Amino acid sequence: MIRRERPELGIVLSFFSPSGYEVRKNYPVADIVCYLPFDTASNARRWVETINPEMAIFVKYEFWGNYLEQLKKKDIPTYLISAIFRKSQSFFQWWGGTFRHMLGCYSKLYVQDEASARLLAGINVHNVDVTGDTRFDRVTDICRTTHEIAQMEALKNTGKKIIVFGSSWKADEQLYADWLRSHTDICGVIAPHEFDNCRLQKLKEEFTTKQGDTILLSELTSITDTADIYKCTKQLKCIIVDSFGQLASLYRYGDIAYIGGGFGHGIHNINEAAVYGIPVIFGPKHQKFKEATDLINCGGGFEVSGKTQLESILNTLISDEKTLYTSGKAAGSYIARNIGATPAIFKSIFDI
């Protein structure tokens, strides 16, 4: 939105993790896309002096003490958007003075919900607006602009149910591998969160069965002849996604989405799938993500704690069209109800 409404401004987009950087390293909206150097005093000082920003915007959990200190020292307006706070966080403990000091470096904090605003008020942080989560706007924009993939359209037309396993880890695959292999009328799209050639090859071998082939997405999309596409998709069992940046476009072809990470450090982006009006399934480690609880409560999301529960939910969804439809509709409606944070924050920051 900044690029569209304020095209004269330069935009530097930084990431700390490879998973974010790899997806956006060629992002045309930003003038510079780069990694953020480690949060040391010297790195922060050099970074701020080199970039010399007019303002800085951090997202959700971006609390980098040295960077915040340098930005405040230079009187650079600094904002935190889509933030969400929990009582268990360090800011709200008796020993959390250093962390509370970080909050004082922000010019304003834009939080997702009233509960976060109340927690902050309890420690005398009042420069707070409740605006919601910008990720709802982002996934809605992606949904509206995703490109069609002809080979996936052909797969959809075969009548097979398609389940997208997004940001999948080995712990996730251990839960759904047997079920997926045993259901000949299901095609799986597996997008591993991290991969190399060895991991991709192992996934191909693991999910190829006598009833169907498993191929890489790049192999599928390289087929351009209509007859060859039809022949390939008719006998497909599984597609392994072997490039970054494709997952958000692939969810549109799914009937169900399983989002990985819930048996590790925490679930990945479930809104990317829910926006397409399909039910989302995920593991138990989702406490940091308000949208997971909200989706469970509205009937659009399902938490699973193990293999048996996952298989039960998958069996219900693929065998009961009414449940599949109502769950998907609930997920899509939840996303639609929560859009609007981005324009609200933009108007506030730029005083429109």
Summary of predicted features, one role per range:
Residues 1-7, 148-220:
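Conserved catalytic-core segment of nucleotide-activated headgroup transferases in glycan assembly
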Residues 1-145, 164, 168-170, 183, ...:
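Active-site and donor-binding regions of nucleotide-sugar-utilizing enzymes
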Residues 24, 28-32, 203-241:
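Nucleotide-activated donor-binding/catalytic signature segment of Leloir-type glycosyltransferases, i.e.
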Residues 51-55, 230-265:
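Acidic donor-binding loop of glycosyltransferase active sites
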Residues 76-78, 214, 280:
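Hydrophobic beta-strand scaffold residues
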Residues 106, 122, 247-333, 348:
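Catalytic binding pocket for nucleotide-activated donors in carbohydrate/polymer assembly enzymes
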Residues 338-352:
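C-terminal alpha-helical cap of glycosyltransferases
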